[in-house]
């Protein structure tokens, strides 16, 4: 019988086989599923015959075909990439696929991850293995027809015509057997159509023996169930189930070409089939099996993404799982039909079969009861526990019976394609087999025992999922969900859940939880609680413990709000630190933290800070948030306040956390809104405070600048007054010196005019009075002076000085020149014409110095008042005649206090040029600039006068450079002047003694000789910078010089 089952397909197709031995590796296990008509060619055959370079036949190049002829032939759809719309259709949800199946539209969209007729390494059908489409010859026929689901979807017309040859591979798509009852029919139909071809051939050739009977010995011996592909004992893992189903699948297909097709075609007899199905040990078959049957059990454990693509956890390629999906699809059906044989691991493996397929479509919300079974297999594929985890969610044995019982209607639900007798015969045969399976299910006590044992082994895992897993557990951070049947599915990684969520598989009412959470919660509530999609990347809150009373829930919500509020405060604190407003920051933060909160909220905030201290080592994703906030809020590391743990932090044995309780969305919303309003209000108040501070700061700066300017002006004025006072003193000393010299030059007494009475002490001069009598006379003349002018203190301070100085020169000469100088000390000018020579000198000197002191109005100086009055008495009418010249000189001196140098002229010129408004007081600005010491103040003053322009900045820079040079030169000149002044003082003291001595003996000389001597004495070396002018000749001409 085995040999007969290898003879399949039409004779002409088998005749195409080129021979060859079984030892040569088959290009790919073939799987013919139909007896081909004479002119029906398989898809792969046509692809193999397709040559891209072929030109259009000449027969078609006629004009009558020109309207419909296209020069460039279109490539086969199998060679075309999928469009975006097709990709989108392939990622439809399970509901859409189920509807398509119910409508007879086929298996629905396949998985994008599978190859589309390109013969990838893991592709299904006859082409599995390492071969690809175009490595095989025509002899393979249509064997790989149903291998690639995407090829199917390229042309639905085949499916519409009822040719289900393409639909078996569609099991690779996201549709899982457990997710639809209606879809189970087409699924069964796939298996039926897959097997109808060889069955009809075999029935035609000899007896009606069932292909199921071929597998009978294998089932009786349970050989393939008890051993793994590598001969070792099996574990209860889903891979074991997959291997078992795979072998069964393979054997079924072996009859159709899985391993026997080559033998059938090349005439190799039944030796290969014997290897595949014989009773002599499964290990002997390994060399004849495809590589997908020989892999390690845990090689391809993994998960599926939203599109159904397999994400291996270890080293399996992505195509491996679509292959598994197809195998699992078949294996599940055939296993259901085969459950009359109670065996180990059947129940353990069955749910995994569907579960593996169910993974990409997690929430089967409209699926039938069996859907919950397969849905949980992959739950544990990510862990090494493998098999034990699978049975955790197995339904009771009644579920198995129900599923088995439902086989019969599912088998018969889709009618076979009309007109296909082989399909009809296959349907009848499968119905008979299903009835046998149903009968066997009713007395499968061994399976019930195995199921009970499996449930016991998974009891711990089940309880762990129901309660919170410790954080150290591998699945603590993975996700579980409850399907509509109440079964728990999982664990799934966050990435998987995110992909399924994006694909639209999850409704907001889906109950989800993490391994570390205690209870399930609707997905919508979790999103509200987390403030984001929980499957999106980001820090995850600590475990949510569900057995908390309402009081603690409320308190935890308040703490969460306080934490959020403190986070906002921390952000403001950092902003204020960045803006260097630390002094105001502390007060502001305290106000914001306490002033805006009600007393209960303040208490909650204090409680939260205590929790921060208690939770120095938070769990999970909070390891960064709370310590950072604790540091930012200056929470002390120790202290009596922080050593108090609240009940909320101690209830869970030190593991309490801010997130230990789910925050109710109804209370979260108002709290968040209130916090947002407070945040906005605080920002607005902060802006106002900042503006107010800036305004105050600006006012303070302006006031400081104004005060500084006033101080500078006051200092400038004082310096100018001091300078004028100093100059006045120097000029007065110089005038006294001149007067002394003049008296000495005219030491010959001139007889007074008869009409002019002599001075008070004129008669006493010749008698050689003592100094005491002289002083008394001088004091008497001073009393007369007080009668003529207002009494002034400086007169009594300085007049004795001059008298002491002059008195030290000797009594005789003093009597002589003091008698002539009476009017200087306030005596009445009664000398008339006899003093005309004196008047001529005063007229010259008053032009330069004497009248200046009076006109400048230095009333506060110590010596200027009496001297100016003396000058007016000495000069008399000639001085009044010079008033116009004095006024001109006064204006000049008032405008320019000191003679201008080159630096001052340059400053004024530049300021006139740069001053656009014309209202700038240039001399005053120059004077202020010259007195300002700080470069910053110079820049500030120039900016206030001229504006913040490049020209003003350049002027300030040049001004500072020139002023520095000028000051350096001034220092050098001052040093020279000090040296010269010292020399002059020494020389002047000696010269005064000499002149006094010469005056004392001048009576021995003639008038001409005496005048010559005095004229020589007039050649004094005076410092021009002190005097303001220099004397170069005996006539006493005045020449102005610069001060600098």
UniProtKB/Swiss-Prot annotation:
Q: Where is the composition biased (Basic and acidic residues)?
A: 148-179, 186-203, 237-265, 316-332, 389-403, 692-706
What this protein is reported to do is described as:
May act cooperatively with GRB10 to regulate tyrosine kinase receptor signaling. May increase IGF1 receptor phosphorylation under IGF1 stimulation as well as phosphorylation of IRS1 and SHC1.
Q: What SUPFAM superfamilies does the record tag this protein with?
A: GYF domain
The answer to whether UniProt assigns keyword Phosphoprotein to this entry is yes
Query: What organism is listed for this UniProt entry?
Result: Mus musculus
**Protein family (similarity comment):** Belongs to the GIGYF family.
Substituting residue 504 to A results in:
Decreases binding to GRB10
User: Which gene is annotated as encoding this protein in its UniProt record?
Assistant: Gigyf1
UniProt cross-references to InterPro entries, sorted A to Z: GRB10-interact_GYF, GYF, GYF-like_dom_sf
Oligomeric and partner information: Interacts with GRB10. This transient binding is increased under IGF1 stimulation and leads to recruitment of GIGYF1/GRB10 complex to IGF1 receptor. Interacts with DDX6.
Modification Phosphoserine, positions = 24, 28, 137, 157, 228, 343, 408, 540, 634, 863
- GO biological process: what's one of them? insulin-like growth factor receptor signaling pathway
Please list the residue ranges that the record marks as compositionally biased, kind Low complexity: 366-379, 855-877, 970-984
Q: Changing residue 500 to A: what effect?
A: Decreases binding to GRB10
* Record-level GO cellular component terms: protein-containing complex
Which UniProt keywords are present, listed alphabetically?
Phosphoprotein
- Residue ranges of the region described as Disordered: 104-290, 306-424, 692-721, 820-842, 855-883, 966-987, 1000-1019, 1024-1044
Tissue pattern of expression reads: Ubiquitous. Lower expression in skeletal muscle, liver and testis.
Protein's UniProt name:
GRB10-interacting GYF protein 1
> One Pfam family, short name please?
GYF
* Acidic residues compositional bias, start-end: 333-350
Q: Where is the GYF domain?
A: 476-524
């Amino acid at each position: 019988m085995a040999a007969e089952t290898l003879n399949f397909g039409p004779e002409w197709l088998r005749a195409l086989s080129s021979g060859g031995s079984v030892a040569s590796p088959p290009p790919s296990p073939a799987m013919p599923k139909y007896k081909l008509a004479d002119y029906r060619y398989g898809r792969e055959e046509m692809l193999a015959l397709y040559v891209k370079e072929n030109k259009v036949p000449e027969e078609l190049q006629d004009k009558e075909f020109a309207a419909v002829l296209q020069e460039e032939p279109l490539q086969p759809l199998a060679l075309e990439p999928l469009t975006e719309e097709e990709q989108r259709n392939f990622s439809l949800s399970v509901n859409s696929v189920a509807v398509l199946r119910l409508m007879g539209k086929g298996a629905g969209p396949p998985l994008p991850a599978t190859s589309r007729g390109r013969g990838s390494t893991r592709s299904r059908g006859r082409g599995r293995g390492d071969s690809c489409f175009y490595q095989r010859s025509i002899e393979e026929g249509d064997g790989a027809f149903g291998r690639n689901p995407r090829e199917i979807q390229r042309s639905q017309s085949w499916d519409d015509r009822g040719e289900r040859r393409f639909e078996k591979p569609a099991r690779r798509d996201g549709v899982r057997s457990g997710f639809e009852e209606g879809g189970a029919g087409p699924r069964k139909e796939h298996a039926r159509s897959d097997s109808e071809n060889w069955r009809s051939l075999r029935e035609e050739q000899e007896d009606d023996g069932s292909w199921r009977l071929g597998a009978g010995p294998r089932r009786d011996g349970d050989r393939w169930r008890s051993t793994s592909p590598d001969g070792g004992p099996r574990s209860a893992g889903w891979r074991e189930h997959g291997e078992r189903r795979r072998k069964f699948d393979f054997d079924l297909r072996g009859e159709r070409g899985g391993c026997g097709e080559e033998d059938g075609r090349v005439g190799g007899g039944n030796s290969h089939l014997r290897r595949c199905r014989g009773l002599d040990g499964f290990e002997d078959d390994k060399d004849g099996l495809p590589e997908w049957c020989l892999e390690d059990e845990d090689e391809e454990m993994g998960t599926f993404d939203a599109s159904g693509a397999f994400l291996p956890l270890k080293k399996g390629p992505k195509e491996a799982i679509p292959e598994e999906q197809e195998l699992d699809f078949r294996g599940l059906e055939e296993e259901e039909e085969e459950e009359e044989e109670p065996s180990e691991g059947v129940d353990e493996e069955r749910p995994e079969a569907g579960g593996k397929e169910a993974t990409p479509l997690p929430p089967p919300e409209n699926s039938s009861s069996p859907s919950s079974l397969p849905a949980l297999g992959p739950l544990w594929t990510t862990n090494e526990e493998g098999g034990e985890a699978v049975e955790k969610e197995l339904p009771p044995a009644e579920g198995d019976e129900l599923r088995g019982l439902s086989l019969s209607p599912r088998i018969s639900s889709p009618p076979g394609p009309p007109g296909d007798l082989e399909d009809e015969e296959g349907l009848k045969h499968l119905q008979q087999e299903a009835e046998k399976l149903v009968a066997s299910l009713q007395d499968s006590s061994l399976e019930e025992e195995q199921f009970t044992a499996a449930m016991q082994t998974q009891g711990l895992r089940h309880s762990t999922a129901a309660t919170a897993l410790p954080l150290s557990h591998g699945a603590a951070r993975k996700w579980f969900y409850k399907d509509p049947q109440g079964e728990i599915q999982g664990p799934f990684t966050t990435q998987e859940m995110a992909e399924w969520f994006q694909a639209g598989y999850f409704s907001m009412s889906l109950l989800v939880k993490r391994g570390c959470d205690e209870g399930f919660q609707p997905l919508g509530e979790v999103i509200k609680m987390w403030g984001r999609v929980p499957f999106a990347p980001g820090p995850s809150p600590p475990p949510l413990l569900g057995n908390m009373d309402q009081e603690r829930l409320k308190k935890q919500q308040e703490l969460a709000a306080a934490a959020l509020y403190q986070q906002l405060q921390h952000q403001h604190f950092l902003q204020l630190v960045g803006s260097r407003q630390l002094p105001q920051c502390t007060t502001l933060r305290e106000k914001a933290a306490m002033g805006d909160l009600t007393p209960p909220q303040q208490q909650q905030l204090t409680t939260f800070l205590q929790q921060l201290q208690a939770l120095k080592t938070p769990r999970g994703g909070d390891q960064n948030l709370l310590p950072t906030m604790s540091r930012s809020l200056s929470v002390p590391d120790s202290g009596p306040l922080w050593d108090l743990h609240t009940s909320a932090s101690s209830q869970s044995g030190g593991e309490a956390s801010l997130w230990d309780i789910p925050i109710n969305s109804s209370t979260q919303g108002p709290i968040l809104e209130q916090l947002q309003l407070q945040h906005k209000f605080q920002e607005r108040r902060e802006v106002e405070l900042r503006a107010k501070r800036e305004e105050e700061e600006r006012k303070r700066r302006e006031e400081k600048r104004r005060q500084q300017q006033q101080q500078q002006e006051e200092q400038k004025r004082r310096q100018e007054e001091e300078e004028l006072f100093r100059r006045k003193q120097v000029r007065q000393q110089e005038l006294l010196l001149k007067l002394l010299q003049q008296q000495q030059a005219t030491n010959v007494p001139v007889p007074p005019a008869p009409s002019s009475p002599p001075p008070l002490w004129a008669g006493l001069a010749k008698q050689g009075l003592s100094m005491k009598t002289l002083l008394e006379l001088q004091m008497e003349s001073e009393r007369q002076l007080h009668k003529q002018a207002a009494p002034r203190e400086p007169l009594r301070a300085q007049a004795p000085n001059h008298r002491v100085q002059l008195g030290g020169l000797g009594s005789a000469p003093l009597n002589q020149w003091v008698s002539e100088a009476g009017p200087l000390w306030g005596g009445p000018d009664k000398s008339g014409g006899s003093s005309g020579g004196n008047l001529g000198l005063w007229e010259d000197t008053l032009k330069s110095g004497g009248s200046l002191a009076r006109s400048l109005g230095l009333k506060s100086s110590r010596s200027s008042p009496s001297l100016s009055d003396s000058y007016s008495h000495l000069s008399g009418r000639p001085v009044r005649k010079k008033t116009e010249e004095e006024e001109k000189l006064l204006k000049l001196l008032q405008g320019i206090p000191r003679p201008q140098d080159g630096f001052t002229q340059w400053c004024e010129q530049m300021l006139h040029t740069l001053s656009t408004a014309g209202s700038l007081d240039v001399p005053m600005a120059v004077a202020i600039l010259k007195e300002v010491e700080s470069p910053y103040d110079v820049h500030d003053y120039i900016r206030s006068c001229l504006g913040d322009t490049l020209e003003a900045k350049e002027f300030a820079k040049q001004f500072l450079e020139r002023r520095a040079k000028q000051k350096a030169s001034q220092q050098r000149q001052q040093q020279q002047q000090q040296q010269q002044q010292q020399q002059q003082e020494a020389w002047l003291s000696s010269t005064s003694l000499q002149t006094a001595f010469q005056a004392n003996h001048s009576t021995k000389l003639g008038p001409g000789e005496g005048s010559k001597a005095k004229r020589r004495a007039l050649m004094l070396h005076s410092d021009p910078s002190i005097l303001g002018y220099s004397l170069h000749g005996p006539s006493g001409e005045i020449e102005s010089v610069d001060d600098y």
